[in-house]
Design a protein with these regions (language model features):
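Conserved SAM-binding loop and adjacent beta-strand
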Residues: 14-29
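S-adenosylmethionine/decaboxylated-SAM
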Residues: 7-14, 34-255
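Polybasic, low-complexity association/targeting segments
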Residues: 1-5
């Protein structure tokens, strides 16, 4: 299904709906689809945090993808580790399906669950690929990962978006997997917000050939730590600046 992406128009074909993923993030997803296509005759996909459905579209298009489960806590106002707030109150599930129909995409293989994966009953299909892009807090990301383990196959991949924001959750995941003696490989894509954990037969893949340049785990953790500290400081400053507007003739910054 997926060939090497050379032009933006080619990328837009697979991602016709707006999403919060960059060009490099999208290419990472397409390369993962290519990896699955090379190793499996069919596969199932689970996504946590679908928003408008923008990251679901290449999986809808892929004939080898037989089942899709979209899990999301809709109609809520959420925040992340940076102190950023996101309002999803006006993004109902039906708006996502409307986006699919507008782009001529069939939705018969998609099922949705409005809530958290921890409340999903352990029954039915197992999944080859999970994309965790829900609430970007360390607690929620770690929780999503732990409960995702109930729904994955022995040979599977779990992808994380906004990896710099949830780097502490990733470090906790390492501790858990090492304690439980579960073999795995981890990569963080350079110049992208994507990272992934590979299980089973995918552990020994040549990731540089599949995804391109990979960032060292040490560099990833160090840069993420600095990013979060700077983001938190900037957000605190914004709050103080907003409060200062109430006071006339006062210097707007407070340290």
């Amino acid at each position: 299904m997926v060939k090497k992406i050379k032009e933006k128009s080619s990328l837009d074909k697979f991602f016709p709906i707006h999403s919060q993923t960059s060009k490099e993030d999208k290419i990472f997803l397409l390369n993962t689809i290519k990896l699955l296509n090379l190793n499996l005759s069919t596969y199932n996909y689970l996504e946590i945090g679908s928003y408008l459905g923008g990251s679901l579209t290449p999986f809808i298009m892929d004939k080898k993808c037989k089942k899709i489960l979209s899990i999301d806590k809709r109609n809520l106002k959420l925040s992340d580790e940076r102190g950023e707030n996101y309002d999803y109150k006006n993004i109902p599930e039906k708006k996502m399906f409307l986006n699919f129909r507008k782009n001529g995409l069939k939705i018969d293989k998609i099922k949705t669950f409005n809530g958290k994966i921890k409340n999903l009953k352990k029954r039915g299909a197992k999944y080859d690929l999970v994309f965790i892009d829900g609430e970007h807090t360390d607690h929620n990301c770690y929780e999503d990962f732990l409960y995702s383990l109930n729904f994955i196959k022995k040979n599977s991949i779990i992808i994380f978006h906004d990896s710099s924001v949830i780097y502490k959750a990733i470090s906790l995941i390492f501790i858990y997997l090492n304690k439980e003696k579960i073999p795995y490989s981890f990569i963080k894509k350079s110049e992208s917000l994507m990272s992934a954990i590979f299980f089973g037969k995918y552990i020994k893949m040549k990731f540089n050939k599949i995804y391109g340049k990979i960032e060292s785990t040490k560099k990833y953790f160090n840069s993420s730590r600095n990013f979060i500290l700077l983001s938190q400081a900037n957000n605190k400053l914004k709050v103080k600046l907003r409060w200062s507007k109430f006071f006339k003739r006062k210097y707007p910054y407070k340290y």
